[in-house]
Amino acid sequence: MFPDFPARRSLTLAALATAALLASCAKPPPPLPPPPPPSISLSSKLIDQASAYRAYVGRASTISPAFANGQQVSDAVRVGAAYQPDQLLRGAIAYGAVAALQDPAFVAGVRAYVGDATQRQTIAYQIMRDPTYAVGISGSASAAGLVIAALGDNGRKVLDQGRQIKQAAYDIQHSAWSKGEVAGRDARLLQAKQLSTTPGLGEVDDAVRLQQASVGAQPLGLTGAAVPPPYSPLVVRSLAIAALAALGYADDAHLDHAEPLMTDPASTTCLNMSKLNLYQCLAVAKPYYEDVFCLGQHVLEDTGACLMKGAGLVAPPDPIIEAAKARAAEAAATKLVETSTKRPRPRRTKR
């Protein structure tokens, strides 16, 4: 009934067999290219913390010691006391990370690992588990030098301003107003405590500049000589955050992985002690010149010393104190010479 059916069936099978043979001989499609490596990215939250830190340093280091009345003293105390220790520390680490990202050698050393997704993830997780892992990355010494220079300079500015203001506490005592009792003493102590628990804010323009600097679009112009390890915990964590940013693991999506590194117990203790000393000082201070001393010593000089110590630096001796010591030593030496020259000579006894 269908005499050509077997023939057609044979042809179909033959065609299928030929197609299968040709398919087996064809080259397989090329593998999909790997995804492009992630770009350098630092979370906007970390950038904001760095900006808030820089804003406080800028305000504190420009408080004028030329006080003319009690209101100026009260205003200056409010400005100086307005930082939250934990936030200031996180801001210092974040700014240190931006500083480290200014070093081309360190960035290149980290970016050498981003081509392989598995290797990139491994390096990032190593840093998350142990921040000191970042110290072993090529270029870390020059990056650490920038971190130390940037944070050390910030701390030195605040410290030096504090010393000038502390000296003003003695100088203004020639003015009658400085010996008047501070108005609302209890309220100003309470306000200092409230300001110490209120997060600070940075400048929008500065945050934009830091964001651009973190990706190499607008360098900050920092300078600093390479420094070999060991480094302070704060510097190590700045390097670690910078390395995670260069690996693509410090952006907003990975912030939960980066935030645990934003700590330094020693610096936290130092800043908290500065605050405690401020509260105790304000609690007993009565005249305005004593508030000026509290501001200079415990708000600014102590805080600046904490920032320098966090960067692994030692606060330099106070030149005013050193000069006073030198004058005292010179006076003592002069008095000793005068005493020795006036001492009567022993009489000779007759034989």
Enumerate the predicted regions with their spans.
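Bacterial N-terminal signal peptides that target proteins for export
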Residues: 2-13
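Short, low-complexity, Pro/Ser/Thr/Gly-rich segments in the mature regions of secreted, periplasmic
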Residues: 305-351
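Secreted, short cysteine-rich peptides and small extracellular cysteine-rich domains stabilized by multiple disulfide
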Residues: 254-318
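Acidic/polar low-complexity scaffolding segments in large eukaryotic proteins
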Residues: 2-3, 25-249, 329-347
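A near-ubiquitous, low-amplitude feature marking generic local secondary-structure context
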Residues: 8, 36-39, 93, 227, ...
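Bacterial N-terminal signal peptides
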Residues: 14-21
